[in-house]
């Protein structure tokens, strides 16, 4: 990777930091920004990552392992060495202008949160949305940051043609748990207010209650879904925790430090979801788990979704609006 050291501080965070790692910014100029998603577990065929690494610092994040491809660690480096892809909007436009490209929803993002704190400064996600709106191309956004409300103007424009679906991730309503598990993220109250603001702006928005960790947050499923529905969410999703690669050891250390009295129970329950391991790459099972605990969690989720989201749904995309080939370049 061709990278350049730029800055060594954190700015623009929604919440106070429990720790203060000195953030380093690296620039990368990729030749490709739209990635084909081969996983049948995910609802979209393509994803796009304006950044690599994430200052949010969620201990369970499956994307931590991808930072090792850059020669960084999956631990503190993932949270404090952020790769910025400044040319992403231009590369995206080149992709959309290709005669071989056919409209298909692109997810922001796959291995990062596109509204993490550095987005305040670099505004790459906003530029990407501007490109997508110009070419009337469908996009999905998943985030746990209230910064998304900054871009309501573009999201409204996309929503007017059924070109956007937003999912706000809420793992817990317990702020004590949120602060140690997702230390540099927006509070659950801010995320619920974000859902409300987007819904009032007629932007289709749902709740992603993920990941579900038995013994930590599984019992909150009904409360989380109800709160999201009360604030205007039109649908809900859920995934089970999976701890692949280095993430497993990081989570194990975190769990033993913060919940020593419950460590064995929680760890063993996570293992029971994935055939006796915390590492699971099997399509289908990895996102839902298996066994009695997984079945109980799934039943609780389905009952809660039926109760609080009856008659609601995420509107489908309209792929016919895509301006194939475009006219004049934005750049």
Positions of the model-derived regions?
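Auxiliary Fe-S-binding modules of radical SAM enzymes
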Residues: 1-29, 35-36, 219-331
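Conserved Radical SAM active-site core
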Residues: 16-52, 56-167, 171-179, 187-200
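A structural motif corresponding to the C-terminal end of an alpha-helix
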Residues: 131-137, 194-205, 273-276, 300-311
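Short hydrophobic alpha-helical runs that function as membrane-insertion/retention elements
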Residues: 140, 206, 236-238
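Active-site glycine- and acidic-residue-rich loops that bind
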Residues: 146-149, 213-222
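Glycine-enriched alpha-helix->loop->beta-strand junction motifs that scaffold or abut catalytic
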Residues: 160-163, 204, 231-234
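Conserved strand-turn element in the central/C-terminal portion of the radical SAM core barrel
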Residues: 173-175, 181-184, 197-217, 240-243, ...
